């Protein structure tokens, strides 16, 4: 996750951003994060995502440093970085490919609670990994002892529902149907 780069001073001086270029780039990243949110909200069948806006979207660089975030539910943002880092630890950067979509909801791997599902997609340009688009949203149900996974009498995390380590839902642009089936078989509301 720590990409080591050796740069001489002359190159650094040539690559300094002037304020106008910086603002243009900042605006582009902000627009991309906000657009991610708009698409997620409009495409969602879940009232928690569509109406309550219990989700967050962000763009991180190669080192998982935040570049931009959408202005919806910022409470997720601090932990989203740790989920992204857990995904990278699990697969390693060389095994994360264009077209991959990787999810995780394990509270011990950067999650907040089981119902908050994080999805990471790598961002490539001309074959080089530049960063990651990351979304975290509250799923209504992932199994467990009670609908919604919040059983008041629960004594173990297993009672909250399906706990996923980082797993590829799409690999190189191809859906892994067995993972989708696991997710769908562990919810009471298949459309949420």
Regions found by a protein language model. Give the residues of each.
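Acidic, glycine-rich active-site loops and adjacent beta-strand->loop/helix elements
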Residues: 73, 106-110, 136-141
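Generic secondary-structure signature for well-ordered alpha-helical cores
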Residues: 30, 34-45, 65, 89-92, ...
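A short, polar/charged loop-to-alpha-helix boundary motif
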Residues: 75-87, 140-149
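Long, charge-dense accessory insertions within large macromolecular proteins
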Residues: 2-81, 85, 185
